[in-house]
Amino acid sequence: MTTPDIALPRRHVLDSTMAYREAGLVGAPIALFLHGNPTSSYIWRNIIPPVARVAHCVAPDLIGFGQSGKPPIEYRFQDHARYLDAFIDSIGMTSAYVVAQDWGTALAFDLAARRPGFVRGLAFMEFIRPMADWSEFHQVPAARDTFQKFRTPGVGEQMILEGNVFVERVLPGSIKRRLTDEEMAAYRAPFPTPESRVPIWRLPNELPIAGEPADVWTRLEAAHRALAASEYPKVLFVGNPGALVSPELG
């Protein structure tokens, strides 16, 4: 199993590269791990080892995150889907059991809708979905206020690009225990400059709330309809307290 301080293998993907962690049994069913914002495949470091006893685990760093490249793109949801597709194709993956959290869930739902038969099973938590209004976004009112600021022109850029608030405050604030210095260093490493934090800033602006952004809303509505109609096995992990997902959903 690769440790966070060792350079991960990379694949040439479109006009850039994507890094990934890989462990487990060659020839076994694939477990594809998809992280969210502002993390990387590092978030799965304690989950992959036990799963690797029965599966071939692959955990990419999404484009712009972790040790993956940062090409000059907008880092919209559609960009992440495009690069993830290319990564999957580059390693010849034809099906997988998917484990996803945060924006990784949106990518998983979208992937399953566009590639029938690819997803053999889905384990997910804190999932992204079309939300009618801000009251559906988060269980904590202060968090809703913060994310509304992230979407306010000029304010969000100052908070995330200049202040690195997402890494320094939102991430550690969403975890019950205190992150170690080593863990925080791993999460900070991909984002040393304001320019490098554009991928972090973009994703709060992609959240499908009250019909906006329209293209993301439409795409994820279709993905959720496909999810509801699908027959592959699924398991939803619900925390107490939850963040994006309330304990009542469990």
Across the structure, where does each feature detected by a protein language model lie?
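Flexible "cap/lid" subdomain of the alpha/beta-hydrolase fold that forms the substrate-access gate
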Residues: 2-24, 30, 58, 65-99, ...
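Conserved HGGG/HGGXW glycine-rich cap/lid loop of the alpha/beta-hydrolase fold
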Residues: 22-67
